Swiss-Prot record:
This enzyme decreases the intracellular concentration of dUTP so that uracil cannot be incorporated into viral progeny DNA. This activity is sufficient to exclude uracil from the DNA during phage replication. In the case of dUTPase mutant phages, the host dUTPase activity is not sufficient to exclude uracil from T5 DNA and uracil are incorporated, leading to decreased phage viability. The keyword Cell membrane does not apply. Its cofactor is Mg(2+). It comes from Escherichia phage T5. It catalyses: dUTP + H2O = dUMP + diphosphate + H(+). It is an enzyme of class 3 (hydrolase). Pathway: Pyrimidine metabolism; dUMP biosynthesis; dUMP from dCTP (dUTP route): step 2/2. This is Deoxyuridine 5'-triphosphate nucleotidohydrolase. Belongs to the dUTPase family. One of its GO terms (molecular function) is magnesium ion binding. Its EC number is 3.6.1.23. InterPro entries: dUTPase (IPR008181), dUTPase-like (IPR029054), dUTPase-like_sf (IPR036157), dUTPase_trimeric (IPR033704). Gene3D superfamilies: 2.70.40.10.
Amino acid sequence: MIKIKLTHPDCMPKIGSEDAAGMDLRAFFGTNPAADLRAIAPGKSLMIDTGVAVEIPRGWFGLVVPRSSLGKRHLMIANTAGVIDSDYRGTIKMNLYNYGSEMQTLENFERLCQLVVLPHYSTHNFKIVDELEETIRGEGGFGSSGSK
């Protein structure tokens, strides 16, 4: 179970369907009506609070990714995704970057990104070795597996 703490009731994440992989996170600019809109100029970024803090079970992590509609507006998460560790208790933030040529206006409580919760392999369970086990792919990197 994931516990969710809200800064404001309207920050409640939205789950789009029964089989949705993530929950939509909203922009939270505060409760002052004068602060209901924010703009991001072309080539600039804006750190946005979601008003949501989570308690993710140990062995899992949250991944903040853009909603597909952000691309239509030429907005992206500045570092492409955000990792929320299970021991983090602060509010989740989204750093959005405007890679377009027009000013983009955001509304208070607008759904912008989504939080997907995934299991992870412990980063404390590793061993330094001199050689790795051989595979058919080997060291083939970008494009090595073909495109068709």
